């Protein structure tokens, strides 16, 4: 992770020049995760800074409580439990390109550290045996996604969701939700040409994601417990922690990195991290990386 300290003069506006923005994008595409130390105390300036890199925002974040009177800034997942490695919403068409985390308060004892795993490195470390399996066998998720506004009708209605990999899509009036199956591979194209990243929702228990009703491989193939445990152990072997300080901002390439959280001590009631999810960035995918 590369740390960036913005010029103190910038703290009044956080408005970057074209060259400064280009430098941030170049570092982001190279490293995949950036830390802006003590960026600002102003939540308005924070959002204005993020807006310089965002074309649109992910709707999935709406399931979390809103913060600072801004519908784009949300709480992270509630509770004190450990959250296992995952790429945010990688089980659905709502997967954001960039996930931002901002530290309002690091907490009283440092528990609940955010963790991250580089999917590029993890994919590189996997043996050809596993790579062949994941390249040949896509995952199929069975989903039930809540709809924010109340809908009226009876039973279910066939629905059209225009996104590759979506099938069996229905509007469920009784559940006030959209239900569909989503087919997706466990590996992603990265911003670096000809390099793949292992960033997905395979390592997180299903009970952590109420939207996922089922998960399996499309061709009814299975990973045995020994192989699953090996891949999980390998992921955590290269996992790193973020030591939070007040007003730190982390920018994560969600198509490259998986992230999670250590367990929070029950006595640590002051930890406060918020998230913003950029659905589509406003700079070209892989625009600064060379064709190596």
Residue ranges: model-predicted function:
Residues 25-37:
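TRNA-binding/sensing appendages of the translation machinery
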